[in-house]
């Protein structure tokens, strides 16, 4: 993987290369199958990274490698279902979409419509303010009705931070593989 962050260990200090890629694939498959059968999310390791052009830092939640693999598996199942229902001109955190496509759409509308509105916004602390209950309800109404999948997502959302004695009540953890998809599912109703 070209993403160097993918090698960052979670609270269990396991890495993708040493603890998963160098093991027999049968062991890895068995481990992930067990994770789905008896899913208990581990606490998340907190890491702060610089925000480009700003003095402040952005908190990232680093799940364990096992939890990241489970998140990726769930994302693979959910993404086509959710993508089929998202607004076609929403471009943030979407596969096969980028800012160039958003700008092309703006240019097209500006030259073909007599009247148009452009709304620019930045949802401050978007991930931090997503209500878990509303998100899970939204997923259910979109068609994600498998109880086990919803329970695993709920556990991922509520994963606490190592060294903190609290349960996460709002937002998917920033840094989670599935977090951008869940944020889009939440925001799509707006």
Give the positions of each predicted feature.
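Charged boundary/loop elements
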Residues: 1-5, 76-89
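Amphipathic alpha-helical blocks
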Residues: 20-41
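Hydrophobic alpha-helical hairpins/lids featuring a short glycine-rich hinge
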Residues: 51-77, 84
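Non-catalytic, polymerase-adjacent accessory regions of viral genome-replication enzymes
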Residues: 1-25
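Residues immediately flanking
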Residues: 11, 76, 121-123
